[in-house]
Amino acid sequence: MAKRDYYEVLGVSKDASKDEIKKAYRKLSKKYHPDINQEEGAEEKFKEISEAYEVLSDENKRANYDQFGHDGPQGGFGGQGFGGGQDFGGFGGGFEDIFSSFFGGGAQRDPNVPRKGDDLQYTMTVTFEEAAFGTEKEISIRKQVKCETCDGSGAKPGSKKKTCHYCNGSGHVSVEQNTILGRVRTEKVCPVCNGTGEEIEEPCPTCHGKGTETKNVKIKVKVPEGVDNDQQIRLAGEGAPGHNGGPQGDLYVVFRVEPSDTFEREGDDIFYNLNVSFPQAALGDEIKVPTLKGHVMLSVPEGTQNGKQFRMKEKGIKNVHGYGYGDLFININVVTPTKLNDKQKSIMREFAEVSGEEITEQPTNFKERARRFFKGE
């Protein structure tokens, strides 16, 4: 019986993308998997689907199939000789794949070797104060954990596993390839048992044979003192479960720090904008200013100019790596009064006169401004 067209087997067009081919394979393999579908012919159908996907998911194999079909290239170089425009890549992967098959370079990683689980990432938002002083918070993340019912085996408790029918327990299957040197036989991991050599007879009712289940897990996280935006910590063993008895992956917690209503932060230094009145700036004053650990008095000397910056050493944030503390910088903003009463205006005029300044006061009402405008004053 002639083999069916691989594109027809997967139900895709000849110009289907890799994603479309993968999607079709997943859908069909799930439908006809021998562990799920016990109907007659399902096993053969599954083999046919697996074979079609193996070819169409590989660019070189697919190109070879598109050009030569199931039989592969016939008669070596045929009548084309070396000038027929035939690329070696059309023969199933070229010389590299061929010789790697002969000399062992094409051997695949043993799927039964214990492997560490995947690492996970969680973004945690903390307040400015929590980042400055450190704290402990509890988070809840949804992740894969070992199934408690089957203890990760994937099998129903009390049931047994059976020898894989597809590879007869070897964990590998032989696949023949057409190459420029003829047909080459290679060993590949069994697609049914994934190299274990065993099949689950009765899947676990909780995880349905996967060995893992998705749960909300609560984890306590210590927020380091002095942590800043985009910095992260690693929680060893809090990631996804390992494979074949391997260790769990890690959880990386990335921090997002909310801005403060009082301070601005640059690294370990913090900045505070202090508004002072004209008399305070001119005469000097003792002014109470906030710090991370309460208020302190700042001596503002007489004649302080707008934009002046004062520095309080080690009043900033503790370095997250333990390299001391940052500083607190206080920026002075001299506030000019917008509304003066008559007495205040009189004092200011007197001050200007004593200082030898000639002040041309600007009118505040519309009529006076209009009168001066038309008089050219």
Curated annotation (Swiss-Prot):
Q: Which residues bind Zn(2+) 2?
A: C164, C167, C190, C193
Q: Does the keyword Metal-binding apply?
A: yes
Q: Which UniProt keywords apply?
A: Chaperone, Cytoplasm, DNA replication, Metal-binding, Repeat, Stress response, Zinc, Zinc-finger
Look up the domain of life of the source: Bacteria
UniProt-listed GO biological process terms: chaperone cofactor-dependent protein refolding; DNA replication; protein refolding; response to heat
Gene3D superfamilies cross-referenced by the UniProt entry: DnaJ domain, Heat shock protein DnaJ, cysteine-rich domain, Urease metallochaperone UreE, N-terminal domain
What GO annotations for molecular function exist for this entry? ATP binding; heat shock protein binding; unfolded protein binding; zinc ion binding
Q: Where does each CR-type zinc finger lie?
A: 134-216
Q: How is the cofactor bound?
A: Binds 2 Zn(2+) ions per monomer.
Q: Which InterPro entries match?
A: DnaJ, DnaJ_C, DnaJ_domain, DnaJ_domain_CS, HSP40/DnaJ_pept-bd, HSP_DnaJ_Cys-rich_dom, HSP_DnaJ_Cys-rich_dom_sf, J_dom_sf
Which residue range or ranges hold the J domain?
5-69
- Ranges: CXXCXGXG motif repeats: 147-154, 164-171, 190-197, 204-211
Residue positions binding Zn(2+) 1 = C147, C150, C204, C207
Q: Where in the cell is it found?
A: Cytoplasm
Q: Which cofactor does it need?
A: Zn(2+)
A GO CC annotation given for this chain: cytoplasm
Q: Which Pfam families match?
A: DnaJ, DnaJ_C, DnaJ_CXXCXGXG
Q: Mind telling me which SMART domains this protein's record contains?
A: DnaJ (SM00271)
Protein purpose = Participates actively in the response to hyperosmotic and heat shock by preventing the aggregation of stress-denatured proteins and by disaggregating proteins, also in an autonomous, DnaK-independent fashion. Unfolded proteins bind initially to DnaJ; upon interaction with the DnaJ-bound protein, DnaK hydrolyzes its bound ATP, resulting in the formation of a stable complex. GrpE releases ADP from DnaK; ATP binding to DnaK triggers the release of the substrate protein, thus completing the reaction cycle.
How does this protein assemble? Homodimer.
Membership in a protein family: Belongs to the DnaJ family.
Q: Domain description from the entry? A: The J domain is necessary and sufficient to stimulate DnaK ATPase activity. Zinc center 1 plays an important role in the autonomous, DnaK-independent chaperone activity of DnaJ. Zinc center 2 is essential for interaction with DnaK and for DnaJ activity.
Full protein name: Chaperone protein DnaJ
